[in-house]
Each structure stands twice: as structure tokens, then as C-alpha cells.
Amino acid sequence: MKHILLSLSLLSSSVLAQDTSLHDYLIDGEPWKEAASGYAFTDGLCCDAAGNLFFTDVKAGKGIYKIDVATGKTDLFLDNLPGISGLQIGPDGRFYACHNKEQRIIAISMMGEVEVLLTGVKCNDLVVSKKGHLYFTETPTLSVHLITKDKKHLVADAGHVQKPNGITISPDERTLAVSEHGGKHVWAWRIEDDGTLTAGAPYMTMWLPVGKETAAGDGATTEVSGRYFVTTELGVQVFDTAGRLAGIIAKPDPLGKVVSVEFAGKDHDILYIAAGEKIFGRRLKVKGYFGQP
């Protein structure tokens, strides 16, 4: 019954589900292009309103890096913040980060001033709503957490998602989606007015590699029409608003790993992925939700 109610909630949003395929997303002659290289383990992709891309190097990085939207040049943007795995710019213009190395959730001003929001958590990835509610995944404890706009901490869900990892939100901010690293589903919940989660269900089913029982779901993001992009062992799996798989965007390196995904660029139509030591991007027919005014 919860799954049915959630389905009706999604279908009654401003975006109606349609049958789609990758032809609705991909542009002929637009392959993956290397955007940055020379890192140990890139992660934490996020963007700002101008379309600049920010990322981290979890294993060996010094802080937050920036790929400039105008020049394509990569520079260290904020120093002395090693070990960040999840990153997003919130409605107040600050970075919000899963500082996994220090087991804490922090907010960081563009000048590098740090506010500690929560400690003692093995956080992985996060998303922040326009209302200011922050949701993050804690993979080892199989839990999804909420820090409300009033800075109250709640465990929003526990024990259901198999190794929760990537996390994103629908454009109407009524649905939260979380990928399973240790399973084959992307879970979805209805977001109530107070930020709490209800009606959780395994809403999307990821394709599995041959002979494996897990899809290794990782990073996740959303485009403006409400479709979900999730990194997996097979590539970037794309789901429509009804939870149907539209297809899989192949990885730049068939043997490589992709962990984080985000739209950026001047028109927010370049899909970027964190792939080990490199960042790749490719222009699509659709635009990302995050960073939009």
C-alpha cells in the first residue's frame, strides 16, 4: 500500500511520466570528454548557479576543487578540508559537506569558514532542500538522516536500504531518492512539510552486472523534469519519474568506476561524473535541477 501511495504521489506532481529512452537525453557526436585529471579518487560533485563545477579528492585531496565554467581550468578553491565525500551548495550560498574523514556534517562559507552541524556520524553523501532541510546517508548503519532547517537531527529511516549511498531530491522537493550500494534498488520517500520522510519504498530497480547480486549504486542527481541519474557498476542508469529505467549511459572506461554525478556548465546541460582519478563530462539534451535559480 505504501508503494502504491508513493506512486500516486509521484504521478500527481507537476511532471507526468512518459516512456523515454536514451535518445531523449544523448546528443549524437557528443561523447565523454575529460575535464580534469591527476587526482587519486574524485567525488562530491556539485555546482553553483553560474554552472561552475566543484569536487573533492577523497583520498589525497586538500579540499574543494573548482572547474571554472568560463575557462575550463581547475583550481583548488578551498584548502585544508581533506576527506569530503558529499558536497552541495545550500540555499544560503554555503557548501554543505559530508566530512567523512572527521565523521561530521559541516557547512562551509565561500571564504572557508566552517560550522559544525553534527558529529559522530559515518556520513557518505547529502542533499539540501530549498527549505534548508539536509538529508544524508550513513552507509555502515544502513540509515538515512535528516537535519532540519532548525538544526534538529533525526534518523529518518534505518535498516531498510542496503548500504545507502547516493542521494537526491525531486524538482518539486516532495520526493527523496537514495541508491543502494549493497542492493539493486533506488529507494524513494515522500517528503512531508516538516521535512520528515514517509511511505518509503524500493521504487526504482537498477540493472545488475552479469553474475552479480548488487548494482553498486552510488552517486545520484536529478534533471529539471524529474528524471534520476544514478551511477552504478554498469554506468549511469537513468530513470523516469515513474521509476522506469530509460537506459544506461556507458562509462568512459568500461573497466573504470564512476561514483558521483552532477549537471553543470553555463546552461546546466553538461553531465559530469567522478571516475577515479579523472572527471569527465558530456553535453546532454536535458538540464540539471541543482544550481537552478
Report the location of each language-model feature.
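Short loop/turn segments immediately following beta-strands, especially the blade-tip
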Residues: 189-196, 284-290
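Blade-level signature of beta-propeller repeat domains, shared across WD40, Kelch, NHL, RCC1
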Residues: 260-293
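Short loop/turn segments immediately following the C-termini of beta-strands
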Residues: 58-59, 100, 139, 181, ...
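Beta-rich, blade/repeat-based domains predominating
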Residues: 37-50, 80-99, 103-104, 119-136, ...
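A short beta-strand motif characteristic of beta-propeller blades
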Residues: 31-36, 73-78, 113-118, 152-158, ...
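Beta-propeller domains
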Residues: 55-75
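Blade/loop signatures of beta-propeller domains
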Residues: 18-31, 291-292
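A short loop-to-beta-strand structural motif that recurs across blades of beta-propeller domains
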Residues: 63-65, 104-106, 143-145, 185-187, ...
